[in-house]
A protein has these predicted regions:
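Residue-level recognition of tetratricopeptide repeat
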Residues: 41, 75, 82, 123, ...
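Register position in tetratricopeptide repeats
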Residues: 45-46, 79-82, 86, 127, ...
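Canonical positions in the second alpha-helix
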Residues: 58-59, 106-107, 140-141, 174-175, ...
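Cytoplasmic C-terminal tails of single-pass
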Residues: 317-327
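Helix-start (N-cap) detector for alpha-helical repeat units in TPR-like alpha-solenoids
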Residues: 33-34, 67-68, 115-116, 149-150, ...
Length: 327
């Protein structure tokens, strides 16, 4: 969903920059710059982004002070970077991203009061996961143009990258309020809600997406996972089963369903109580001592009698000592 929409935004950005005078920019001088821009737009629409960047470069050569050329070429470079990523060319993607950043920086230099330059620069930084720097660009753009919902949305992406869930919810909610058909904002807001453990709100957003498109298995699976986190395992299993009916080879969803099934079984199982081991009460202890005390007393008396007999036997037959005193 994100890649497709990003592609659309990129092409629209090219068209807008080419056809509209940028705030604070001087009108382009006459010459061949316009034809190169039109040719670049055509190539971009045909997804020949590197060739489009070359055409925009020719337009820049003809009119080096026109910020539109840098904006267009930066957009083409960025889209070429995305294409390189899809092809597994990380080095090529990095080179194109850096070229895009340089062009958008030049765009800002030539038109510092144009919010679009900061938005484009920030979006590129965000794709490079440099979220703090991207956030600064988006905030600057919104200072210049507070009602730009596209910038608000891009800022929401950066806030998700920084785990600023509450701020992301606020930004995506602002976008939805103005553009209720922006399904991507519902999806991202649901992620932020889920990360905040506001599972009911996340489930509501995923349910809205499913209502709009019942065949959206991605939203169905995400809702199932959210149900599982909320310990609503039966609902989670139903969503996972719906996904597996369409994509039976989805091993990840199958494993999640097995987990939900095991948790549901454990939740429904009635635990067998273990009988406690009784401990003697004070009364029982007293009765025990009552039984033991006479026994101890009897043993003691018998021992004394035996000692007395032994002493008597030992002293029998001995002469009693006589007194030497004359009587």
């Amino acid at each position: 969903m994100l890649n497709k929409q990003s592609l659309t935004v990129a092409i629209v950005s090219v068209l807008c920059c080419a056809g509209v005078q940028v705030d604070g920019a001087k009108p382009a001088k006459g010459g061949g710059g316009g034809s190169h821009i039109q040719r670049g737009i055509q190539l971009a629409q045909e997804k020949h982004y590197d060739a489009a960047a070359d055409e925009f470069g020719k337009a820049i050569k003809d009119n080096p002070k026109d910020p539109r050329g840098y904006a267009n070429r930066g957009t083409a470079y960025r889209q070429a970077a995305r294409t390189a990523i899809e092809a597994g060319d990380s080095e090529g993607a990095s080179t194109r991203y850096q070229a895009a950043l340089a062009d958008f920086a030049k765009y800002i230099e030539l038109a510092p009061k144009d919010a679009s330059g900061y938005t484009e620069h920030g979006q590129t930084l965000s794709e490079l996961k440099q979220y703090d720097a991207a956030l600064a660009d988006f905030n600057k753009a919104l200072e210049l143009k507070p009602d730009d919902i596209f910038t608000v949305k891009f800022r929401g992406f950066a806030e998700i990258g920084l785990n600023q869930w509450d701020k992301a919810v606020a930004d995506f909610s602002a976008v939805i309020q103005k553009k209720q058909d922006d399904l991507q904002s519902y999806d991202r807001r649901a992620l932020a809600y889920r990360s905040m453990k506001n599972y009911d709100a996340a489930i509501a957003d995923y349910t809205f997406l499913i209502t709009k498109n019942p065949n959206d298995m991605e939203a169905t699976t995400k809702r199932g996972y959210t149900y599982s986190l909320a310990q609503q395992y039966q609902n989670a299993i139903a969503d996972y089963q719906a996904e597996l009916k369409v994509n039976p080879q989805d091993n990840d969803t199958f494993q999640r369903m097995q987990y939900a099934q095991s948790m549901l079984a454990a939740k429904n199982a009635s635990p067998s109580p273990t009988p406690p081991i009784p401990s003697p009460t004070p009364e029982e202890e007293k009765r025990l001592m009552d039984k033991i005390s006479p026994l101890y007393i009897g043993i003691g008396v018998l021992a004394l009698l035996i000692i007395a007999v032994i002493v008597r036997l030992l002293t029998r037959g001995k002469a009693e000592p006589s007194s030497h005193r004359i009587r």
